Swiss-Prot record:
InterPro entries: DUF480, WH-like_DNA-bd_sf, WH_DNA-bd_sf. Belongs to the UPF0502 family. Gene3D superfamilies: Winged helix-like DNA-binding domain superfamily/Winged helix DNA-binding domain (1.10.10.10). The lineage of its organism: Bacteria, Pseudomonadati, Pseudomonadota, Gammaproteobacteria, Vibrionales. It comes from Vibrio parahaemolyticus serotype O3:K6 (strain RIMD 2210633). This is UPF0502 protein VPA1223.
Amino acid sequence: MKVELTAIEARVIGCLIEKEVTTPDQYPLSLNALTNASNQKSNREPVMALSESDVLDAVDALIERRLVSDESAFNSRVSKYQHRFCNTEFGDLKLSEQEKGIICCMLLRGAQTPGEIRTRTNRLATFHDVKEVEAVLEHLASEEKGPLVVKLPREAGKRESRYMHLFCGEVDVSAMAAAVPATSSSSVRIAQLEQEVAELREELDALKAQVESLLS
């Protein structure tokens, strides 16, 4: 796999993919909207406190690598950005809706179990059950051109193994396995509550973007 991102670049790409699906009327995103999305307290792990300068540096680096494009209208005072991370006409990375939803969720949240992924991707893709999530994860982990995700060793007492994307380089499996997440049942409930908060945040961000567009 050729694409390797920094943590901030991964956050930026994840946010652009997320907003493309969940708030298409507000996409592409302005720098302000992208910074707000990157710093969301819901549906983000870890929570970041990035400045617009931090985000712009990441965006500029991604534009140079043709992973993001500036879609600003002629003479517009506000730049608008969209991702070119996957499913572009000449790009190598082609993802299904389910694969794209999973990768987006991992770029925003890091390592997660199939159950957590199913709950957290409910606005990005449709999965009928956890087994369907597991099947897509296994496909992503065995891509012919190189794995896109890796399955982490299952921790003692846990029902599910976590999976992690490989877009930020190789994963230290032993270190990741040592990180102890919440128990299976509580983590799923927490994920559901986080998703509800995320949806409210989406509505608020959409309103902010509308106000911003009126003022620009």
